[in-house]
Amino acid sequence: MKLGVSTSLFLDTDKNLSDALEILEERVKYVELGCDGNLNVMSDGNIELAQSYDLKYTLHCPITDLNLSSYRERIRKVSLDFVRDVLEVAIKVDAKLIVLHPGYCVFKYDYEKALNSLIKSLNDLNNIQEEFGVQITIENMPSYDMFMFRNPDKEIIENLGELKITLDIGHSFLNKNIENFLKISDKIAHIHIHDNNGEFDEHLCIGKGKINFNNFKKDLKKINAIKMIELQNKSIDDLDLCIDNLKEILR
């Protein structure tokens, strides 16, 4: 059973990366490292720190600043350059894969340009993946209009090439498309798991929202991917309960 927890649980708390890894090493074998805030693995000394633990890692690219869907070419290219920086860190900590947000488009008028930019970025990312030898995955996004890849759109899926998907169950529930994503399970290499009440992206403990995981637990079990719990700091006290609930689902 490949079960892990993201360090995002400790974002904006008084915990540093060492504190987070100490807590998680007692509970799981897989941990998702981030590149933001107090847990930024790219900060001085944190790469060596991560290397010192007996853990297997995935790596989440920065949540902010990057936009692979920007039709402003300089911004798109700088975003790709930063992905290269993240991949260098991934190699150093022996990360299995990296997770990348697809970008955003604020104005509907610009959507087609943004989609074309994203497709161009997917092509570039295939070349970058081949260069670094680390699997790149694109995460499906929650139900806010500005985000790209909220649904398994044909134009995006057909242009993934050798890239894979990180299926975020909570995001998919908000978009009412869990089944649609599970139909392309061969494209899924990684799974983010958390709960919500169907209104916004709460990142709750499994069982504390409205997602009926039993409806698709057979499909989850069949997918050869790390099931990565991704909670927010308001759910720190629920960590052990969430791990137990996920184990029960995957049993």
From Swiss-Prot:
InterPro entries associated with the record: IolE/XylAMocC-like, Xyl_isomerase-like_sf, Xyl_isomerase-like_TIM-brl
Coiled-coil segments on the chain, per record: none
Entry-linked Pfam families: AP_endonuc_2 (PF01261)
Family: To M.jannaschii MJ1311.
Protein name (database record): Uncharacterized protein MJ1614
Organism in which the protein naturally occurs: Methanocaldococcus jannaschii (strain ATCC 43067 / DSM 2661 / JAL-1 / JCM 10045 / NBRC 100440)
